[in-house]
């Protein structure tokens, strides 16, 4: 081919290419490829290189002929590679210095396992809606910061760009997302991969309570730990009360340890599709968060509160009451180890456990004080507890008889006959009044 090339003038070769409408001839020889500099409109050549996956030609052009194609050659190739779904070429171009921001704003969508939405099967690259387009039938794309509002049960994250230069492109803006009739799908990432979340956080995704619960449901422990670390480093809309309620131990302990009283909350407004920030300065209510941790069975948070903020967590009998009400055996064991009397309040704890059908806890308390069997026998009219001790699986909890209401039992704990007890500095419990803590020797040292 080289011999033939030199036998004919360049102008004739150009005429052959144009009249045959076959630009493939440009790619058969380096000499022919050099003719590109004589062609004014180079877009069809770029399109051909990308569409036909002429990867070696692309690499050669980047290395030796980039000036021939103009200043935006890399970005033109990048755009074409995204449109054609040649995503590995797009990655290569970005690695070589192509400006990814030339694609416009980055958006996200999440997809299911089949990547099918409203009977439309997504493909890499350009996706064009067929048929009537309106606000309900188009492709929904989201800003990175709000994508976590739309995780649902999806398993993949997709990069999305809007092909604004395409003929016929249309879009609507609704709340905080767009609806378009054309989108360009980039790389697919799995939502159970840690690197996916690092990528999302890098692009500004806001961590919400729903995000952490999504990762918990999918048993993504490393991702949960990473997200909590991110929350410790930056302020988001998960405060200490939510952390204690949901058992975000690392985050809750961070708040407690550092006595964070100024929390920055980013509020999300669905109707406007916006966030705004509100700095709230307030004293942490340690008694309240101790109760939240107890109600929801988060023993590590409670332990840290009791042992590090002992002067603030309040009456341990109230905490024991909540542990019995919600049936958290490990917390009850912990409180018993501290020295909490299980017979206080006219045996309110025993009755409360009976009412909640927590026979497993009553069985444990028998090892602490065998005399409570007399209380149990008084309410065990049909011998349900005896049956449980013989065969726990034989009991139907719907048959229990509850002699007292929770309100009645709570009154016993709050009555003068049950003097409040608190965890003291010397790792013990005592019955001093809460207001007397400032008088404890060495308390303010």
Swiss-Prot record:
It comes from the Viruses. The keyword Thylakoid does not apply. It holds the Pfam family Ank_2. ANK repeats lie at residues 73-102, 285-314, 315-344, 346-375. Gene3D superfamilies: Ankyrin repeat-containing domain (1.25.40.20). Keywords: ANK repeat, Repeat. This is Putative ankyrin repeat protein L797. It comes from Acanthamoeba polyphaga mimivirus (APMV).
């Amino acid at each position: 081919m080289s011999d033939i090339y030199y036998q004919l003038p360049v102008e004739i070769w150009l005429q052959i290419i144009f009249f045959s409408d076959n630009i493939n001839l440009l790619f058969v020889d380096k000499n022919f490829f050099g003719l590109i500099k004589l062609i004014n409109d180079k877009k069809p050549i770029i399109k051909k290189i990308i569409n036909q996956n002429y990867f070696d030609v692309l690499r050669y052009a980047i290395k030796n002929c980039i000036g021939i194609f103009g200043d935006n050659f890399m970005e033109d190739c990048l755009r074409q590679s995204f449109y054609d779904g040649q995503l590995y070429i797009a990655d290569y171009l970005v690695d070589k210095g192509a400006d990814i921001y030339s694609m416009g704003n980055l958006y996200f969508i999440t997809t299911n396992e089949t990547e099918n939405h409203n009977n439309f099967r997504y493909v890499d690259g350009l996706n064009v809606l067929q048929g009537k387009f309106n606000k309900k039938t188009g492709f929904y794309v989201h800003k990175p910061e709000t994508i976590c509002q739309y995780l649902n049960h999806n398993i993949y994250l997709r990069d999305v760009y809007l092909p604004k230069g395409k003929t016929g492109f249309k879009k609507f803006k609704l709340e905080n997302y767009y609806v378009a009739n054309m989108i360009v799908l980039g790389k697919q990432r799995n939502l159970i991969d840690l690197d996916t979340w690092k990528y999302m956080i890098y692009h500004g995704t806001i961590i919400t309570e729903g995000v952490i619960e999504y990762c918990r449901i999918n048993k993504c422990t490393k991702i949960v730990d990473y997200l909590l670390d991110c929350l410790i480093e930056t302020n988001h809309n998960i405060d200490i009360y939510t952390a204690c309620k949901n058992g975000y131990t690392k985050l809750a302990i961070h708040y407690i340890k550092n006595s964070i009283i100024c929390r920055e909350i980013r509020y999300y407004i669905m109707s406007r599709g916006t966030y705004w920030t509100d700095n709230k300065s307030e004293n942490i209510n340690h008694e309240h968060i101790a109760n939240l941790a107890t109600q929801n069975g988060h023993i590590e948070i409670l332990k840290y509160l009791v042992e590090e903020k002992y002067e603030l967590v309040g009456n341990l009998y109230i905490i024991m009451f909540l542990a019995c009400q919600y049936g958290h055996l490990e917390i009850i064991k912990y409180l018993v180890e501290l020295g909490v009397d299980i017979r206080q309040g006219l045996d309110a704890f025993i009755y409360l456990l009976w009412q909640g059908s927590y026979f497993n806890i009553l069985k444990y308390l028998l090892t602490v004080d065998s005399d409570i069997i007399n209380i149990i026998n008084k309410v065990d009219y049909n011998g349900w507890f005896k049956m449980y001790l013989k065969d726990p699986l034989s009991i139907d909890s719907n048959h229990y008889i509850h002699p007292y209401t929770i309100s009645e039992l709570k009154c016993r704990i709050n009555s003068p006959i049950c003097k409040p007890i608190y965890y003291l500095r010397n790792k013990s419990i005592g019955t001093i009044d809460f207001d007397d803590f400032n008088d404890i020797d060495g308390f303010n040292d």
